[in-house]
Amino acid sequence: MRITIDRANVSVEDGKVIIDLDSAQLENILNADKVQLSTLKPKDEFKIGDEVFIVLEQSDNGTKVISKEFAYTNKVFGDCSDWKESPIRTLLNGDYYNKIAKLVGASNIISMKCDLTSLDGLDDYGTCNDKISLLSASEYAKYHKILGLKSNYPDWWWTITPASTPSNDYFRFVCYVGSNSVLYWSGCGHCNGVRPFLNLEPSILVSL
């Protein structure tokens, strides 16, 4: 990277070279190793802070991404299969959201409408709006090839999709991705990993 500085902005004081930079020049230096998120393709990786994310999709509505590693491990889904009641949802849209918002700006995290339709097609739980969520089972199917086939994950990880719902006398079973990348379901009291799913403003600058 090359920055042109007017000689008038360079001085020597006590044997030290002093360079006066304007805000644009300073910004160029600070962002020298960053790229605009919109330039990345599905499967590309980038960093927010010390966390690595994978680009899943670029669209007019934002850039959908997922954490490469588990942000949390051994997390219980909750007391039932309704994502709206899950302590993981509270965690992601509380402490975790605050951490990411400090790094990218709150206005650059785009709210998502989450479909809580069960694996067997029941809509008891409706929808909800989240700043940060988990993939649904259908979203996992959509992005499976991007995330990788025959993956070997260190643990199982949750989706937001219930296996069925109370109208079918099932209220405790939730879909998860197994360590072999196959979709299964288990009781909501089990402990699995958490991979945050976000929709970001494509114009933000990110590190590779």
Task: Label each region the model flagged.
Residues 2-208:
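Collagenous Gly-X-Y triple-helix signature in extracellular proteins
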